[in-house]
Amino acid sequence: MGQKVHPNGIRLGITKPWISTWYADKSDYANNLNSDWEVRQYLTEKLKAASVSKIVIERPAKSIRVTIHTARPGVVIGKKGEDVEVLRAQVAKITGTTAQINIAEIRKPELDAKLVADSIAQQLERRVMFRRAMKRAVQNAMRIGAQGIKVEVSGRLGGAEIARSEWYREGRVPLHTLRADIDYSTSESHTQYGVIGVKVWIFKGEVLDGLVPQIEEPKQQPKRKPRAK
């Protein structure tokens, strides 16, 4: 039976950057990795209502720089920047170093797989029909400019006794093309019938790094000469 590789993992270093960018000695590596995990857990829990897509962590010169990518920067910053100061102090406490927090706004949340998956999960918790939630997400992404999108939900859909999976796709989603810019993410919806998993793939185009795509024109077949009678 065929298995699927993680769309983001296979593209790391090709079209996808790492979300933790730092180097460390062997003795410090495990501590840094653990503190990265703790920082992400804290910020994800604290900023549930802020539509956070990803958290990028850098460690320049015995300090830590955290960039929060969010569709609602006002919720993260708070009144006169008070909330950011609270976050910065807590991150510094977790890591034991000086911390800096940057906010990056996501201009098109309809094209961010994590935000789309979270949105569908929240709609399912509000008892919106899963087909309607999937179709709405797909239509919004295609309207904004996605070249393709696929959405899959799995679990006791509509309160059914037997769990199943359903998916909806529009456009093209070339998972085997490494230069394809595919954003992939998952989310969970905790309903009264159990947990429903949500997966989203969004194809935004191909990353060619200045190369011009070559389109081969079909070769014309030579005309056959009529047989001599």
From Swiss-Prot:
Superkingdom in the source lineage: Bacteria
Gene3D superfamilies: 3.30.300.20, Ribosomal protein S3, C-terminal domain
Pfam family, one: Ribosomal_S3_C
Occurrences of domain KH type-2 (ranges): 39-107
One MF term in the entry's GO annotations: structural constituent of ribosome
Keywords: Ribonucleoprotein, Ribosomal protein, RNA-binding, rRNA-binding
Keyword Aminoacyl-tRNA synthetase (UniProt): no
GO cellular component, one term: cytosolic small ribosomal subunit
UniProt record, GO biological process: translation
Keyword Transport appears in the UniProt entry: no
Listed PANTHER family: 30S/40S RIBOSOMAL PROTEIN S3 (PTHR11760), SMALL RIBOSOMAL SUBUNIT PROTEIN US3C (PTHR11760:SF19)
Quaternary structure (record): Part of the 30S ribosomal subunit. Forms a tight complex with proteins S10 and S14.
Function of the molecule: Binds the lower part of the 30S subunit head. Binds mRNA in the 70S ribosome, positioning it for translation.
Family from the record: Belongs to the universal ribosomal protein uS3 family.
Name assigned to this protein: Small ribosomal subunit protein uS3
